[in-house]
Amino acid sequence: MGYTIDAAESGCYPGTTVLVNKFDLRSQSELDAVEAALVTAKAIQWEETPLCDTFDFAHYRAIHKHLFGELYDWAGQVRTINISKKGTQFCPAEELPRVGEAIFARVRIEHFFCGLSRERFAEELLDLYERTNELHPFREGNGRTQRVFLAQLAQNAGYRLDFSCVDADELMIATIYAAQGIDLPLKDVLDKIIKE
């Protein structure tokens, strides 16, 4: 997890940083293990049979609900608290609905990135990646939701994203740089994962 939040609004079990969950797991390592197994299976399931193809903010939230719904009551719902991580402050909670709708409206205006050259697709994907990362609409599970959404969007546009081509730490570092306005590392990462 690793988010910085107000302890009174944490949604965690008292005296811990473990999120309240449907399995009542109070050990972070146990929750991480269950979460990893469930979310991996759910991501594969979504990839094989997407439950939504509107590519709007409701679609994004539907992916989160699908991935995390067996774990958290709030899956698919935008967070109601402000969060930051590793020095990055994410979109204020009260702005999430408006900003989220605007981000995904742009995807629609750009025709879901269909018919773009690889170079142009990479530029649009970079912008959307940065915007959805800055949005960070959920209490937990933002990166995994983002990757499932972007992979589906890419497939719809005639491309494929292979996140296994990059190390998780490399992606995280590139994302941190992008949040500081330094796009090149994330551009390089996306160049590796976009397949035709």
Language-model segment annotations:
Residues 1-196:
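FIC/Doc superfamily catalytic core
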